[in-house]
Every structure is written in structure tokens, then in C-alpha cells.
Regions:
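Short Pro/Gly-enriched beta-strand edge/turn motifs at strand-loop
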Residues: 106-111
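Short, basic interhelical loop/turn and adjoining N-cap
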Residues: 52-67
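Short Lys/Arg-enriched helix C-cap and helix-to-coil transition segments
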Residues: 75-89
Length: 330
């Protein structure tokens, strides 16, 4: 079964969610409300969300939803995310090597409730598979812990044939050693003041990795890259071109923050924030799978606008789900 229509993807995603596990706010309705909040551009807070829902036929209290965000196990949302990831992986033939840029982004927490707990930001780390255009496992860490401390978790994100591509924030000899011990290939930009020998190798502590230098003539910038990818697999020129694909994850962060509210955390607790982040990434994966009429184009923002127009005909996602896919109610 090939998923490319919005109803088909939603049906595949939500059909197994229970509708009778909670008396007031069942799991399917809980997830549907979150999708409404992310997909509707005019909603910027939970109060906005529930004002719309309560005036269009969905009788659930904001307090009930807020309590569910605080107490419910986010595994049900994680299950939806990994269900889509598994489908995308199966739909793409495996390649010998896949470039996987990885990076961290900071999500500010604006509520004073978080400040009182000592949290002013959440750090999100993931990879972006350049073959499937899908994100990988997520690291969600409150506080200011540096991303370089998540080396082992980052390695577990990568597919077996993945090449980790990272920026200078991840340049560390200890991290390089961890990659080497784990037989994980990497291409990571290093600082220009690092020293290397006459054969363009730097010692990591347990091994040596080669250094590649390339420049951007227009910007007058030189890049120094450390890699353990053998030269017979990727030449210096290919390493330079591979590093340029790291920019794709920066574009991802920009899209998620501009269009899917990654920088607007609506929940007032860390459990709810984890749920919102996963819903945002689920919507991103839906957009990657979705095929829309040609007039909307092939860019993600065009696909998102198409979904918003479709849903708006039924006022919001909850109503659309109940009317367009009634078999999910059975």
C-alpha cells in the first residue's frame, strides 16, 4: 500500500488508536486535538485551540487536556512517529551509504512556570536522512547541556549505512573516538586552529582521521573537515560535497519553527512539550509522504497550505477526521 493522500496517511496513522480508553478524552481525540493545534496557523496557544474546538462542537475542557498532557505516557505519540518512520524506511531501497546530517536546535521556554523549575530552554537533536528526507530518533533535553555530550545517543540515531555529517559544535577528539569505536562513519567540521601532521591527519587519542580542506571563494571561507571515511570510498572532493548537504538540517529547523510552531511551545510542562515536539515531527513526515495537486507545487509549505485548505472546509482537524474518515469511529 502506497501512502500519498492526506486521508490515506491519517487513516494509516490513527486507525489503531483506542477510542474508549479514557471516559472523557480518549487517545484518538487527544492526538487529534494536538494535530489541530499544529496544523491551524491561527492557533498560538491552548486557549486559542480550545476556544475554537468548544465553539465548533468538541466539548472537552482545557483543564482536562492540560492534565492529560502532564500525566499521559508520550509513548502513544512516539508509536505514531516510529510507525511513519518504519513505513518510510521500507518504501526506500537501501543504499550502500546514506548521508545523515545531525544537529541541535534550541527551543525557548517562555512560561514563568518553567523558569521557576530552572528551565529556560529545551534542546532538540536529530538526524536528517538525505535519502528518505526523514528525521531520526529524537533527543529532547531540557536545560543547557552541550550537544557534544550526546555522542552515544547520536550514534544510535544513525542507520547502519549512515554517515554522520556535523558542524563545529560536535568537533571533539573524544567524540571522534566514540564514532571510531562504534564503526560509525562521520564527516565533522573542525576548528581552523586544530593541528594536523604533514599527511593531513589528526590524532584522536586512539586513532587518526584525515583532514580535508575546501573553500568558498564567494564568501572567502575555508572549511576544515575531519573524517574516518576511507579515501577509496569517498574522495576529498566528495567529502566536501557531502558536507554541503549538512545545510539541509538547518533548513529543516527553519521550516519547523516558521510553519509548524517548533518555537511556540503551548504546553506548560515538559511531558506536554515532548508530546508537542513529536506531533510536529509527525506532521513533517506526513508532508514528506503527501502528494498534492500540481497547482500547490511540491514544496513542503505548499503541501501544508493544501492541508490547511482541506481541513478548513470542516472548520478544524477534529471535525474533518470525524466526517471525512468515519470508519475510524467504528
Amino acid at each position: 500500500m502506497k501512502l500519498n493522500s492526506f486521508p490515506g496517511i491519517v487513516n494509516f496513522l490513527l486507525k489503531d488508536l483506542p477510542t474508549n480508553d479514557y471516559p472523557v478524552l480518549n487517545s484518538r481525540l487527544f492526538c487529534s486535538i494536538w494535530f489541530t493545534g499544529i496544523l491551524d496557523k491561527g492557533i498560538n496557544s491552548l486557549r486559542d485551540l480550545f476556544y475554537q474546538l468548544n465553539h465548533t462542537g468538541t466539548q472537552v475542557d482545557l483543564s482536562t487536556f492540560s492534565k492529560a498532557n502532564k500525566t499521559r505516557d508520550p509513548q502513544i505519540i512516539l508509536g505514531l512517529y516510529h510507525k511513519l518512520l518504519h513505513y518510510i524506511e521500507k518504501a526506500h531501497p537501501e543504499k550502500k551509504l546514506v548521508l545523515c546530517p545531525f544537529d541541535a536546535t534550541v527551543i525557548p521556554l517562555m512560561s514563568k512556570l518553567f523558569w521557576l523549575q530552572g528551565h529556560r530552554q529545551v534542546k532538540l537533536i536529530t538526524t536528517l536522512n538525505q535519502d528518505t528526507k526523514s528525521t531520526g530518533h529524537l533527543i529532547i533535553s531540557p536545560g543547557q547541556k552541550h550537544e557534544i555530550n550526546f555522542g552515544e545517543e547520536i550514534m544510535r540515531m544513525l542507520p547502519e549505512n549512515g554517515v554522520a555529517v556535523g558542524d563545529r559544535g560536535f568537533c571533539s577528539r573524544k567524540l571522534f573516538d566514540k564514532f571510531i569505536e562504534n564503526n560509525t562513519l562521520f564527516i565533522i567540521r573542525i576548528k581552523s586552529n586544530w593541528k594536523w601532521d604533514e599527511n593531513y591527519h589528526i590524532a584522536t587519542g586512539k586513532d587518526k582521521v584525515r583532514v580535508i580542506c575546501f573553500g568558498n571563494v564567494q564568501q572567502k571561507i575555508e572549511y576544515y573537515l575531519a573524517t574516518n571515511v576511507p579515501e577509496e570510498i569517498m574522495s576529498n572532493e566528495e567529502i566536501g560535497e557531502a558536507y554541503k548537504q549538512r545545510w539541509a538540517i538547518e533548513v529543516l529547523w527553519k521550516f519547523l519553527k516558521m510553519h509548524l510552531k517548533l518555537d511556540k511551545m503551548m504546553s506548560k510542562n515538559l511531558n506536554g512539550i515532548t508530546i508537542q515536539i513529536y506531533v510536529i515531527l509527525i506532521v513533517y513526515l506526513i508532508l514528506q509522504l503527501l502528494k498534492v495537486p500540481q497547482m500547490y507545487g511540491s514544496k513542503l509549505v505548499g503541501k501544508l497550505r493544501y492541508i490547511q485548505i482541506v481541513i478548513r472546509r470542516e472548520l478544524n482537524f477534529v471535525n474533518w477526521l470525524n466526517r471525512v474518515i468515519p470508519r475510524l469511529n467504528m
